[in-house]
Amino acid sequence: MRKNGGIFKNKVEEDIEMKIYHAQVNHLENPMGFRMERTVFSWKVKDAEGKKQSYARIRVASDAAMEHLLFDSGEDDKASSLFYPVKLDLEPRTRYYWNVEAGSDAGETAVSEVQFFETGKRNEAWTGKWISCDSKENRHPYFEKEIVPAKEVAKARLYVCGLGLYEVYVDEK
């Protein structure tokens, strides 16, 4: 067994490898629909023999296989796992994939699972029709809209804007 210490959660048994977990963008795991004017990555490391991180490498890609890289920090020995800002030129309504590789002062390395973040609308007009209630009564209106697509949908995203509280259901879910 190894002694406890350092900033990492340490191993209890020798055959456990260093792992990266709780990988986040702007303090959220796999965020969707945000403006992302500033992109900050963070992560945690566990089961490391080392006492501190020796480097980190952030990669951002347009595909989940991480083959089409849009950003690669390289091995940055000054990277903080708590706050790693990256200046990215992000497109609106686009999904990006990312991962982090980190090394410890004991020579260990780990790579996180591929995560994602998705940007929302940005400087775009809302093209939907506004709906409202004609009644002057002081009550809580309920609106329902059935949408029947002209062809089979493989993937869709619904952007909703509303005042107060609202809920959205698709296929009663």
Question: How should these model regions be labeled?
Answer:
Residues 18-48, 118-122:
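Pro/Thr/Ser/Gly-rich low-complexity, intrinsically disordered linker/stalk tracts
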Residues 119-140:
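Low-complexity, Pro/Ser/Thr- and charge-rich linker/hinge segments at domain boundaries
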Residues 3-17:
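Short, Lys/Arg-enriched N-terminal segments with co-localized hydrophobic residues
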Residues 51-95, 101, 105-111, 130:
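Recognizes extended acidic, P/S/T-rich segments that occur
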Residues 28, 46, 59-63, 101-103, ...:
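Predominantly extracellular/luminal cell-surface or secreted proteins
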Residues 137-149:
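Short beta-strands within extracellular/lumenal beta-sheet-rich domains
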Residues 40, 95-99, 155-157:
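Short, conserved beta-strand segments of beta-strand-rich sandwich/propeller modules, principally
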Residues 149-150, 154-170:
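Aromatic-lined ligand-binding clefts that engage carbohydrates, nucleic acids, or primary amines
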